[in-house]
Amino acid sequence: MDGGSGSFVSPDGLVMTNHHVGVGQIAKLSTAERDLVAEGFYAQEYKQELKCADLEVNILVKMQNITDQIKGAVTSGMSAKEALDAKQHKIDQIEKEETTKSGLRSDVVSFYTGGEYWLYQYKKYTDVRLVFAPERQAAYFGGDNDNFTYPRWNFDVTFFRVYDNGKPLKSKDFFKWSEGGSKENDLVFMSGNPGGTSRLKTLSQIKFARDYSLPIRIEFIQTTLDALRNYARTSEEAARRALIYQFGYENSKKAISGQYNGLKNPETMEIKAKQEADFIGQIKQSKELSDKYLKYFDQVDQLLKEYEKNYYKRSYRSISSKIFGFALGIVRYTTESQKPDMDRLPGYNDAALHSMKFRLTSPAPVYKDVDKALTWAGIKLGIGKLSVADEFWRQVFEGSDPREFMNSFIDNSQLDNAEFRTKLIEGGMKALENCKDPAIKLALKLDKYMRTDDKNYRDNFESKLAEAQEKIAEARFLIYGNSKYPDANFTLRLTYGQMKGYEMNGTKAPAFTTLYGMWDRSISFGETGDYALPKRFWDKYTTLNLRTPMNFVSTCDIIGGNSGSPTINKDAEIVGIVFDGNIESLVGDYVYDITSNRALSVHSDFIIYALRNLYDAGKLADELQGK
C-alpha cells in the first residue's frame, strides 16, 4: 500500500500502517479549509470514514515456484537480448493466463538476480477508507532532524478500512492485540514488504552505486528540496501543498545519504570485498566452475565501465512533472493496451494496465504551482549538466525559452482535471491524435525518443547484465544452495529478532522510550518547530501516565518498504508497528550488523493508551482489543 506495508487488525477490514505511509492519501483528502495532515482525523462511525482517492491494498494469497518454466523459455544459442526477450514473453504469458484464470493480480518475481522465479498472486482492493490519523506533529515528532535516529517518540500510526462491495471487508485472518506488549529481550517478528537491497550484488555494482548512482540521486533530491522550500515560503497554502513532497524528499535524502556514507566507509567496502573474494575462492576450487562462471564477474565490471557515460546522460534526461507524467502515462496506456501482450513493453500486462488506469484517473487534487516548482528544478538541473543543445532537451524545447516552455505546457494543460484524463483514456488513440493539450502533444513527441533510448538500454546493457547476474546466481546456488536469503524485492518477508538496546555515541540506547522523554525533548528545544507537542498532549498532561512505553528497538532486519509492518510476538499478537530504522541501519542495504542495526516500532501499549486517553477514540481501541 503506497510503497509500504500493513496488516489486518480486526475482523472488519481494519488495516494498520504508518502515518508516513498513509500521509499521501491523507493529504489528498485535505483542503485549505480542512488540513487533515495538520489536524488529524477520526471517524467514530463507518459512515464518517473517508474514501481514499487512489489507494490500493494488495493481499498475498498464493505463491508458486515457476523457475523451470521461465528458464525453459531460453534455448541454446540465444543471444543475451534474445534470452531476456524470451523470458519476458514467458512472464507476460503466465501473468496474463493466471490473472484470467484466477481473477487475482498475478506477478512473476525474480529472486537471486534471476536465479529463481516465483508467481505471486494478490487479491486487490481499491475501496479503502481513512479511519484514524493523528496530527502530523505527533506522528512525526522531531521532524527530519530525528528521522532515522533513536531514541524516538513518534505516534507514527494510521488506520484504514478495506471495503468490499460497499461494506467493510470481513477479514477472517487478522492479528490480535497483545495484552502488555513486549519487554526487553523478548523475541519479536515482523512481516512486511522490504523494497530492495543490494547484498548479493557484485563489488563492481556496489562501487558503481558509490561513485555514480547515489551521488547523482542525492544531487537531484537536494535540488528539488531547495525548489520546494523556496516555493513553500510564498504563502501558508503553498507550505501546506509542498509539505508532503518535502517530507518524501527529505526522507529519501537522509536514507540515500546514509547508504552513500556507509559505502564511503572503508570497513563496509572491506566486508563486501571479503564476501566476494570468499565466493570467488569457492568457485576457483573447481576448474569446471571456474571456466564456466568467473568470466561473468569481469563481464559485469566491463559493462558498468562502458555504461558510466550513458548513465550520466540518462540521469539528466527527464521531466519531473506530474502533468507530464499523466500525459506520458496516458500515451503509453493507450498505445500498449491496443497491442497483444507479447508485443507490449515490459511492465504493461493487463494487470499492470488496470492499476495504471486507476492511478491515471485518480480524483486527487493536482496543484499546478507545485508542479511548476518541481518541473523547473529538474529542467534547470538537466540543462545545466547537459546543455539545451543535448539531443533530448533539444527535442523538448525546439528553440523555445525553457522556462517559458514549461509555464506554457503546464498552464495550458487540462490534465489536472480527472474527468478530462478519463475521457482521453476512454477515447483511445483517436482521442489522443485529435487532442490539442500541450502536455499530450509533448508526450507523443518524446515517447518515440524514449522508446528508442529504452530499447538501446535493454539491448546493449540490461540484457547483458541480466545474463551475467543470472550466471553468478547459478554459481551461488551450486556453492551455497538456499543458505543465503535473496535480496529484498518488495515481496512478503518475515524477519525476527529481540527487543534490545545498543551502544551508541559512547553511551547506551535503551530498548524502549516512554512518554516522559517526549516532554523532555520538547521542552529542551523550546517547544517549537518539529518539537512542539500537539495541544491535546498539554491539555491532558496531568492525567497521563508518563511511564507508558512509546517506541522500542529490535534487532529485526528491515529496509525501506517495511514501514507499517506489524511487530508480533511468538503468539502472533501485535506488540507494535515498524516505522523506521536507526541511522546505523541505513548501510543495511548492503550489509547487516546485528550489534547496532535496529528497527524502530511504536509500542502496542502506547497505541491503545493514546487512542483512549489522548484522542477519545475508545471505540477504535475496543475494536483492536476485540472488546
Give the label of every model feature segment:
Residues 1-627:
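Terminal presequence/propeptide segments associated with secretion/organelle targeting
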